[in-house]
Amino acid sequence: MRSTVAVAILAAGLSGHAENLAWAQSPAPAAPPQTAAVLPSTVPLFPLPDVVLFPDVSLPLRIFEPRYRAMVADALEGNRIIGMVLLRPGYEADYEGRPPIFAVGCAGVITQVEQLANGEYTLVLRGLQKFEVTSEEAGGPYRVARITPLPEPPPDERQTSAIVAERERVASLLAALADRLGIAPGPLTLRSDAGLVIGLAQLLDLEPPEWQALLELPGVLPRLRSLADRLEALTRQ
């Protein structure tokens, strides 16, 4: 990403994604540890080209394709769990079939749902836990995969201290950037560590494969550290 474009995106994002970010003078407590999730051995797959779900993050979705409307209907009659996976580049050649996907995805549970008059759904999917696709079942209107859960244990005391340090580092970098751009930041609050990761990734305007790489990192601390490194590099340009 060119530095001028990066700075412009960051400048716009400082206000556009303020709900997920915090300044050094307005620290917020860390989010409670993620509740352990017991995933089923198989999950329906919802592959998209530009959306990556993360644990402890809520994702609004609109479901309009008939096959995925059937998927949601079946999920609502069962455990309400759907597996989000990212489509690999080149998916367009076989979008209606079984285009290639990244093996690591994130399972989510439907927490809110509304069926519209035309049969479409609007829903909110709350990220539960990462998984790896080991195989797919044949047949059916939508894809179903056998999975291996990839749990992320809650951070220990040392990791929690490191997360706090990275949050402070991010806050300092954002404050410095705001000063450089002549922006007067207001008192922002931090919803959660996972929310900070998502907000910062949005500020940095990551491409889908970069979101995927972020998901595949083993927890909030390495994700936050990776994004803070990128932010620091950009603010030096």
Q: What are the functions of these language-model segments?
A:
Residues H17-W23:
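Sec/Tat signal peptide C-region and signal peptidase I cleavage site
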Residues W23-Q237:
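N-terminal low-complexity, acidic/polar interaction/targeting segments
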Residues V5-H17:
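Bacterial N-terminal signal peptides
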